[in-house]
Amino acid sequence: MAGSKWETEETNQFAIENQKLEEEWRKKRRLEKKRKRKILEEEEKAEERNIDACRLYLMGNTPELKSCNSIDDYEILEKIEEGSYGIVYRGLDKSTNTLVALKKIKFDPNGIGFPITSLREIESLSSIRHDNIVELEKVVVGKDLKDVYLVMEFMEHDLKTLLDNMPEDFLQSEVKTLMLQLLAATAFMHHHWYLHRDLKPSNLLMNNTGEIKLADFGLARPVSEPKSSLTRLVVTLWYRAPELLLGAPSYGKEIDMWSIGCIFAEMITRTPLFSGKSELDQLYKIFNLLGYPTREEWPQYFLLPYANKIKHPTVPTHSKIRTSIPNLTGNAYDLLNRLLSLNPAKRISAKEALEHPYFYESPRPKDPKFFPTFPSKAKGESKEKNVFQSFRSASPKK
């Protein structure tokens, strides 16, 4: 009985301390956000000085991108989705009678000039062309100077919508095929010194021939070695690497690889691996599953700005991911573990991951033409979950 009382008191004390830490964290974050806004403004001003080439794209003076046409050359069919930086429509190219995606750029009513996120997307998609990166075909304009659309190839789905609505899990052979394509695109992007900085299921588009493509390059940017100081206001919280959450002043390609690890787990379970409510809560969810960092495993951890806000358990902790996702093979677990290494220096690269034994063991990756066909969310079909029933009965695509 005494032991039970002691445990209750210890639990209550731990909760009180955690609440205090959370309050301190929030206060510091408010101050940090003000500082970050200033840094972001300075970064955007610096980037504005280096976007002359991107402005040439809009003027039609770049051979890599077809010159600006009119939006009148396209028929807008229906809205697919709306985000912070744009509205995406399904459209029809009147000259070729082919479907396209039309992304209407959102202009800040209080801003001056072309949105920096859209300039980044145009510059990135014009510089890094790959079979598994969505293709930017044209930039078209309407009658108004702020009526600007990016014309992209049309993809029927995004991975998040599929994972939310599928009645059964992807087969392991299908997960491997999707992962290989994601890693191939990322390896190509990293080889050309670009970071995506917002990899997540909703930014992975998929068509009905088993192809997956990276999209939404609004936060993407070129990087260099040694790593330069970059804004930490990147990557959706649930897919954000621990070094970003801990306030690392600089970072590199490893942040994209962490996001891929989270996506890999989500492809298998159809549930986000770390669904934190705040940055501190996200860190605790990561450490509770993967174990708390040690000096041996991650020496630089204790030098990061917010590391001293983390309350460490009194006893050593270990990864619980194998019990959390029990059906993984040894090789699948090893790949996931290396993608989700707390220490970014030990995180596997996209090029290394492509050669991992996981992709060579049985079952082998499925031929994309044997992938099931899913209803396109562009037609509103994805809202009806019953249309996903018996989706594996689809015949191979020709």
Curated annotation (Swiss-Prot):
Domain Protein kinase, residue spans? 74-359
Q: Which domain of life is it from?
A: Eukaryota
Reply yes or no: does the keyword ATP-binding apply: yes
> What name does the UniProt record give this protein?
Serine/threonine-protein kinase ppk23
Give the top-level enzyme category. Answer: transferase
Keyword terms, alphabetized: ATP-binding, Kinase, Nucleotide-binding, Nucleus, Serine/threonine-protein kinase, Transferase
What Gene Ontology terms describe what this protein does at the molecular function level? Answer: ATP binding; cyclin-dependent protein serine/threonine kinase activity; protein serine kinase activity; protein serine/threonine kinase activity
Q: Which residues bind ATP?
A: 80-88, 103
Q: Which cysteines are joined by disulfide bonds?
A: none
Query: Reaction(s) catalyzed by this protein?
Result: L-seryl-[protein] + ATP = O-phospho-L-seryl-[protein] + ADP + H(+); L-threonyl-[protein] + ATP = O-phospho-L-threonyl-[protein] + ADP + H(+)
Note the coiled coil stretches, chain numbering. Answer: none
Region called Disordered, residue ranges: 359-398
**Could you name the Gene Ontology cellular component terms for this entry?**
chromatin; cyclin-dependent protein kinase holoenzyme complex; nucleus
What protein family does this chain belong to? Belongs to the protein kinase superfamily. Ser/Thr protein kinase family.
The EC designation for this entry is 2.7.11.1
Q: Catalytic site residues?
A: 198 (proton acceptor)
Q: Which CDD domains match?
A: STKc_CDC2L1
Q: Which GO BP terms, alphabetically?
A: positive regulation of mediator complex assembly; positive regulation of transcription initiation by RNA polymerase II; regulation of cell cycle; signaling
Polar residues compositional bias, start-end:
387-398
Q: Where does the protein end up?
A: Nucleus
